[in-house]
A protein has these predicted regions:
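Recognition helix of helix-turn-helix DNA-binding domains
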Residues: 24-60
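Short helix-capping/turn signature of helix-turn-helix
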Residues: 20-23, 70
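C-terminal edge and immediately downstream basic/flexible tail or linker adjoining helix-turn-helix-like DNA-binding
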Residues: 56-71
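Regulatory hinge/linker segments at domain boundaries
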Residues: 1-18
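Hydrophobic residues on short alpha-helical segments
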Residues: 13-20, 47, 65
Length: 71
């Protein structure tokens, strides 16, 4: 079975790793020396590549972290 994280770039995996620490987008900016818009783009890419679509009953950030932890 293919690891869903294989679709992520190295930088997207770094962003996801900081998300897994429970950090906000602002904290990700500060840790990785990125602009807020860049972090938003990486987070969006993570959600898209992990096939996490917006849904009223789903917290995509939590689902992304769960995928990271299971890998």
């Amino acid at each position: 079975m293919r690891n869903p994280l294989d679709a992520l770039s190295e930088r997207e995996r770094e962003v996801l790793a900081v998300m897994a620490e429970g950090r906000s987008n602002q904290a990700i900016c500060e840790r990785l020396f990125l602009s807020p818009k860049t972090v938003e783009a990486y987070v969006h890419n993570v959600f898209t590549k992990l096939d996490l679509h917006p849904a009223p009953d789903a917290n995509r950030r939590v689902l992304a972290v769960l995928a990271y932890l299971r890998a």
